[in-house]
């Protein structure tokens, strides 16, 4: 789920952004890729048949049963062969999904089992909201897994942020705790784009952050003619393993016509400093309206610094280069990481600055002084003359930095029937100064088979985590060729 206030002079409106020939073309692209790319282990399918296939809750809209999008991954530091993946299950065309599902493995990703999470009415024991979105999971040092959701109704404006925990590696999940709820009859508030981060050294402690879009009153007709919306960042934490959570509080306050989105915390395990990264959206509303920004806390979230801007987020958006059809991506969502040994910070995002603003590529900036200064944005992806999108970043204990992303390099000129898409990784061994060792992780697959949510959609983000052994593991979505009853699956790279 992603809600963003979009300004349309002279009024403001709230837009729910959810944004044989085929076989032969994809086969040809795959054959070319096999020649150009070194051999590596095939990705493992993580997802399976939808547990919500019989659920009829949540309309109106087009529901893509068996379509999985937007995965996230966390490795259990107490047992690294145990990992949890979470994703949206049965994506809707106009926002969210039937529910969220957790996949879990106890053999390092060779095999996976699955269970519904209790965040929506389609799930056993779930909250009574019609849909769920924005899956997230994070393991603490004692093996407790924390997961969060945006849960909401399509039939009205009721919505909430909820959290659930697992003490058995993802097999079962606790009844959800509601961190904040803004239910009907109010139409003033919508909570969105949450994430959760477990403290890597303090067992039982985890932090949730999200943005809340706020209109000035509960009259939706009056709100059509106001410019007084805003979207501050909220924060809640648990110190008892998810049994209780602190009252939600604002940690980034913004004036009218400004908002944050994509909040995500990383923790320095040596100093305990918390860093919350986000997109700070400010007028004038043009390609530079978004800014990659962060705040920090040295007292476990009690107080926070003022926002510091790292760089303009100059996204151009993503479309099919040959047809102009929209592809919905995480174009306004920065992704951060921290070196657990040195505390060096990294953040990646989509940006058009490297090609004159014509299409998105992958930018990275890094800080070695706790965010006091940042490097100029560096292009990470291999230039192909085509868009690259949905970056993820992680750092291992030796300081190696992996960035993953999709791109359209496999698309041939004149091909308007398919959109071959590849998933790639690159690594830096010099603190983010250079990136090399490019390798294909997945694809090519046809993006045009993905659910359409105001654009072909496989998620605003994809998963990536690293084992204590410095083994990186991407988690990502691909489409399934020619199977419209099972458009997408989640894959794990061993």
State where each predicted segment sits:
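C-terminal PAP-associated
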Residues: 41-494
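Gram-negative bacterial Sec-dependent N-terminal signal peptides
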Residues: 2-14, 18-39
């Amino acid at each position: 789920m992603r809600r963003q206030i979009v300004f349309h002079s002279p009024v403001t409106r709230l837009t729910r952004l959810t944004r044989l020939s085929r076989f032969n073309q994809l086969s040809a692209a795959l054959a070319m890729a096999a020649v150009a790319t070194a051999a590596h282990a095939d990705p493992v399918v993580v997802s399976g048949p939808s547990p919500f296939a019989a659920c009829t809750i949540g309309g109106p809209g087009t529901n893509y049963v068996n379509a999985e999008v937007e995965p996230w991954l966390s490795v259990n530091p107490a047992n690294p062969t145990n990992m949890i993946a979470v994703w949206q299950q049965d994506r809707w065309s106009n926002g969210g999904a039937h529910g969220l599902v957790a996949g879990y493995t106890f053999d390092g990703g060779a095999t996976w089992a699955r269970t519904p999470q209790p965040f929506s009415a389609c799930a056993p024991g779930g909250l009574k909201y019609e849909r769920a979105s924005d899956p997230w999971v994070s393991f603490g040092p004692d093996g407790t897994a924390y997961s969060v959701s945006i849960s909401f109704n399509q039939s009205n404006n009721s919505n909430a942020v909820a959290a659930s925990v697992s003490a058995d590696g993802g097999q079962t999940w606790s009844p959800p705790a509601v961190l904040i709820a803004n239910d009907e009859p109010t139409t003033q508030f919508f909570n969105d784009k949450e994430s959760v981060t477990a403290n890597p050294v303090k067992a039982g402690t985890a932090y949730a952050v999200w943005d809340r879009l706020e209109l000035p009153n509960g009259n939706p007709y009056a709100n059509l003619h106001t410019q007084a919306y805003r979207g501050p960042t909220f924060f809640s934490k648990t110190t008892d393993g998810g049994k209780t959570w602190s009252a939600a509080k604002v940690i980034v306050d913004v004036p009218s016509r400004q908002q944050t989105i994509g909040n995500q915390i990383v923790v320095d395990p040596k100093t305990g400093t918390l860093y919350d990264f986000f997109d700070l959206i400010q007028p004038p509303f043009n390609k530079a309206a978004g800014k990659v920004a962060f705040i920090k806390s040295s007292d476990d979230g009690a107080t926070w610094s003022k926002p510091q801007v790292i760089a303009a987020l100059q996204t151009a958006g993503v479309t099919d280069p040959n047809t102009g059809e929209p592809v919905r991506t995480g174009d306004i969502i920065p992704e951060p990481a921290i070196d657990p040994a040195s505390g060096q910070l990294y953040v990646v995002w989509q940006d058009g600055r490297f090609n004159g603003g014509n299409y998105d590529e992958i930018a990275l900036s890094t800080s070695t002084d706790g965010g006091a200064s940042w490097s100029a944005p560096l292009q990470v992806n291999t230039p192909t003359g085509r868009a690259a999108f949905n970056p993820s970043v992680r750092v291992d204990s030796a300081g190696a930095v992996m960035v993953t992303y999709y791109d359209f390099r496999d698309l041939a000129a004149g091909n308007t029937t398919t959109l071959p898409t590849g998933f790639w990784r690159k690594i830096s061994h010099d603190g983010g100064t250079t990136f090399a060792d490019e390798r294909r992780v997945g694809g090519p697959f046809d993006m045009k088979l993905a659910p359409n949510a105001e654009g072909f959609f496989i998620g605003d983000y994809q998963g990536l985590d690293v084992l204590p052994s410095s083994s990186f593991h991407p988690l990502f979505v691909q489409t399934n060729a020619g199977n419209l009853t099972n458009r997408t699956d989640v894959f794990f790279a061993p």
